[in-house]
Amino acid sequence: MVVAEQLEDVFVGGYLVIYASQDGAGEEYRLPKEVVARALPVEPGRVPVNINHDASCRVGSVISIVDVEKGLFFLGVVSGSLALAMFKYVARDLFRADDGDSPGGGAESETRSDEALPANTLSEREKFLYLLSNVLPSLSLSSARLADGYSPADDFFAHVALCELGKRDGTIAIYGSSPPEVLDAFSGLDDAAKRELARSAEEWTTSSRREEPVDEAMVSECLLRKFMNNAFLMDRGEYLRARRHLADVRRPKYLQAAETTCLSSANPRSSGKAAFSCEARGLDEAGAGAIGRAPESGMAASADQHAQDGIKIRLERSRSQIGPGAMSSVSQPAAAPYSGAMADSAAQVPSAQPPRIPCPPTGQTEMIYVPLGTYNDLVVSAAQARRGEDRRQQLSAPPPQHAQQIVQRETGINSSSPALAPAGRGSYASASHIMHQPAFQTQQPCWPQQQQYVQAPCGGHGIGYYGQAVSRRGGSSGDGAPTTRSTGAPGAGGLSMFGMQHAGPQTHFTAPLHGLPTGFPAHGSFLHAPGYLGAMPPIQVYAPQPQQHPPSLDTRIEALLAALEKERASEQGAAEGPQQSLVAGQNKKKALLKRSMEHQREEEEDDESAPEAPYFPGEAAASCKRQAKRQRAAAEGEEQVAPSFSDLIQGLAALHKDVAEMKASVAGIGAPQASQPTPVAQPEHEEPKQAPATVDASSSKKLKDSRRAAEKRRAADEFARIMSTE
């Protein structure tokens, strides 16, 4: 590509240093704000602008450098003669932006190389700005090395280099045809700094100063050296995007952010090689066409549209330009590699993705921008479709080996043979239950000859594991036997087998079933396959029940007292008003709190005292106590802290003792004491020794329960002794 004449100078601007982001470059590249302030201002034109820090390749000058709150910002000028050296290596059709419907557009424009381009193409200056923005997108400042005792002077700034990626973060270069076009790209730059830079640029322009022509041989050498040094640079676009964000550059006009270097919609080279196609992202053209709309005129996006954040996707020019036979040649999606009997039905199950539309011929493609959010939705949809295929592959797997072993061990029936397969929960699915089950309905429409397989809800009947997958065939079954269609199903019909259920009209199914009687073909076609599973009676499974112990007398008395107390409390609450009920509830809460505190205090006291006889785990007495305690808690609704039955017995025993002492004292005062007869020795009868009582010493709470039971027994023995003396 050759430029007829030298272009006018263009402007460049950007941050040379961002004060808050200097850690990544290293300490030797750190520039403190106070040091920079002593080196300013800079005389316009004194600091040169070169390529890759090559002093012999000067291409412009620095107009002004200002110190703002965010960092050190500069505005410079680049010589228009640099375009002559760069355009020598640019293809002629790189910047073509023809209108496909215009006389100069489309395929005809490829043969008109000597004629003038249409009026809607980019100007030479805009092409030059695109080249600079994409070939030299960054800035790098060269300054004097800071040392102890060094004071910045007029020669502190050596030069500003245009490069691929600078050492410092946020040093992005923005090019423009005028100073406002450069400065407006930085949203974080304050108005005062913009006015100062614009005034300096106006003074530079009014002075009619122009940059000297560049050395084309030196420029070519520098650009080749730059290419060789940066050929292995990884993630260049990510670095530039991060630096634009750090520099508050929101909408760069000439910075090409896409992964293709071509701006043309009718470029044959870009459509075949450099164009970013849908297949590179795992999507097809139909997925992109669902969100993008081809312009009616087929014209490529303008320079302003290229500045938006998005992803280029190759689309058809328009449906009217594809031709009548293109849509008829739509290829069906390839079936997933299913295994077993599921492979035949997988090809007829509708895919989650839309039909695949073939790519249009070369020269009839165009690039559009797709919003990142919509593109992410496409990626998620493709991932969900892949997960659905993986799920269907998992469902097509045979039942696990351990399931067959469990079935054979529990029932004595080999599930691999053509006998009855066991159902879940220890029973067989009856024919009457299966035939009266309603079909499982799905929200997706049932297309003709294409049915949806869905997961059936878990119930009490049905096969207890996933068996062989269900497939649908036409013609004959897998073993060559003629297939038939069952019409005796009620309603719409449904298939419920092996944990799967099919919704839809009467449909031809062929499936290898484990649950058929002996002699029935292994492969068959029926609408309600589980209806054949009702020949065997249900298998009863008996689970061991825990041993029940009758509650003791104390437990029944305490439960009766608690029930009477609750009934009395409910009657009082019904008789009282709402306010009195509220007060009673509060008093009850206080009483429960006080009782729990006393219970906790008693537990602490019980922890200090040892039980009378230890309890060894495994004895029957402890299980009886635990069972009685659980029954008492279930009957009362809450744990009883201190029963009142033992207190009544102790009080009654003390009363009888006092009465006996009073009688003895009265008899001693009123009558003389009689001589006591000598006791006659009676033969002692040895009573059978009782087994020592045991208590549960596993916790303080159990110790407390044992202590209470011992107190009750002592009180009962004392009461019996008193009653016997009377």
UniProtKB/Swiss-Prot annotation:
Biased composition (Basic and acidic residues): 702-720
EC annotation from Swiss-Prot or TrEMBL: 3.4.21.97
One GO process term, biological-process aspect: nuclear capsid assembly
Class in the EC hierarchy, top level: hydrolase
Polar residues composition-biased segments: 402-418
Domain of life: Viruses
Region ranges (Interaction with major capsid protein): 706-726
UniProt entry keywords in alphabetical sequence: Host cytoplasm, Host nucleus, Hydrolase, Phosphoprotein, Protease, Serine protease, Viral capsid assembly, Viral release from host cell
Record Pfam families: Peptidase_S21
Annotated GO MF terms: identical protein binding; serine-type endopeptidase activity
Protein name in UniProt: Capsid scaffolding protein
Organism of provenance: Psittacid herpesvirus 1 (isolate Amazon parrot/-/97-0001/1997) (PsHV-1)
